[in-house]
């Protein structure tokens, strides 16, 4: 399962985990990706998408019009 948000484009990034003794270890930070079913009112159908938590908040505030435009392009 790829961990990339289709709306915001968020994906993994690399960084350091730093202990109390200031030891650095390389690690990979994953985005908070959720699999969601969203009702598209314009198309009268459900779609399954992988969205980040930030994208879910954007859709709840602005509606599904942006998501519908993005999915029609694919």
Swiss-Prot record:
Pfam families per UniProt: Ribosomal_L28
Signal peptide: none
Recorded GO MF terms: structural constituent of ribosome
BP GO terms, sorted: translation
Keywords per UniProt: Ribonucleoprotein, Ribosomal protein
InterPro entries hit by this protein: Ribosomal_bL28, Ribosomal_bL28/bL31-like_sf, Ribosomal_bL28_bact-type, Ribosomal_bL28_sf
Single GO cellular component term: ribonucleoprotein complex
UniProt cross-references to PANTHER family, sorted A to Z: 39S RIBOSOMAL PROTEIN L28, MITOCHONDRIAL, LARGE RIBOSOMAL SUBUNIT PROTEIN BL28M
Family as reported in the entry's similarity comment: Belongs to the bacterial ribosomal protein bL28 family.
Name the UniProt record assigns to this protein: Large ribosomal subunit protein bL28
């Amino acid at each position: 399962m790829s961990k990339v948000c289709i709306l915001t484009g968020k994906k993994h990034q690399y960084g350091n985990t730093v202990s109390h003794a200031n030891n650095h270890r390389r690690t990979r930070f994953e985005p908070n990706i959720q699999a969601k079913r969203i009702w598209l009112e314009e198309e009268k159908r459900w779609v399954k998408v992988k969205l980040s938590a930030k994208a879910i908040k954007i859709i709840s505030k602005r509606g599904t019009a942006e998501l519908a435009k993005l999915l029609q392009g694919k």
